[in-house]
Amino acid sequence: MLNRILTLGALCLIVLSCTPTDSGASGAPNDNTTKMEPDYSNIDEETLDYLGITDPEHLSAASKRALAWPEGSRSNRWFIEYKTFDLKGDFAYEEGVVRRDPSAVIKVGDTYYTWYSRSTGPSQGFGGDIATEKVFPWDRCDIWYATSKDGWTWKEEGLAVARGEKGTFDDRSVFTVECLPHDGKYYLTYQTVGGRYEVRVKNQVGMAWSENPDGPWTKLDEPILSPADNGVWKGTAQDRFAVEKKGDFDSHKVHDPCLMAYNDKFYLYYKGEQMGEEITFGGRQIRHGVAIADNPLGPYVKSKYNPISNSGHEICVWHHDGGIAALVTTDGPEKNTIQWAPDGINFEIKSYVPGAPHAIGLLRENDDSDDPLKIMEWGLTHKYVSYDYQIIRRFEGARKERHRAKGVKTE
């Protein structure tokens, strides 16, 4: 053993003696590896005043970061606050009924439409009878739709897309739906579960289309998106954390699909769950991806750049300034941010927005406005009344223009 240690030590000394250093005799870094400090000598007075920096010769790390912000990010343009409200009509709370995950709000004529996940009865988790009971609130769901004239009072119109026949890929549940109107047709994309809802079950994405928002809907016979197949479970127990290999970021499930017409193609944004998921940065290991097709019906090819986020949960994306904007919530180091990608793939943080509603259904008639957040003026969200039951609510967003104390009068 001693001889092995001495031999390894000698090898280390040889390697170190043969490795060029980055320092000269004085210990200063080599010119080729010096990290250049930005030049702060020519900062204009307006910028210094705006950032509250009075001595540019003595800059803290925080002040240097502030000076490095892109000029457009220093404004209030991408920052927003939210309020939520109960709705009337059939979206008021109904005992024993789950209504959740509303789609985008689509205006057809003078009528607003939304689609959503609907089920009945309590959920028993994986400790119940999986064959006959619900595992989650979104288990044993069908997709229903509702209409409204004012965005406040909603009428439940009925079933849009039902679960598939026994033995099909969507025979257990269809849920978390989104709608894309395009060229006179309507495309619903949604999450599916087939067979037994076990811990290791792999979710997929299905599609239905119609020439009328009221249906009838034609379902595709096969899923348009599936999880990656390069993860390897460890053992046969129903344990989603036990893996020999985790695989791609979406090796377990593909969730929350949202289809966008973009750059003369169709971008299917989705949430990925990985086999052997871990808790990182205080939240679940969730990331987003995109699959692209030339035709809305597919085939869809996953981007080589996936994952395109390192954080997030439900997909919430919209067009802006030739690119795609996204609200990223709930999980990961960049949760509670609004991001923007000029190419729909390479997203950068534009703002931090704590308190954003979950499972947002955007008002699509405000899509692609010059104002990046006009689409957030109002829309739909859901709320947990209890673990078993959720309701659909309305949210409204607005920029915070001033911070005013109570009682201060404004002109």
Q: What spans do the regions from the language model cover?
A:
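Short, conserved catalytic or interaction motifs in soluble domains
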Residues: P20
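Short, linear, compositionally biased motifs with a strong N-terminal bias
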Residues: L11-C12
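C-terminal motif of bacterial Sec signal peptides marking the signal peptidase cleavage site
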Residues: L16-S17
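Sec-dependent signal peptide recognition
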Residues: L2-L8
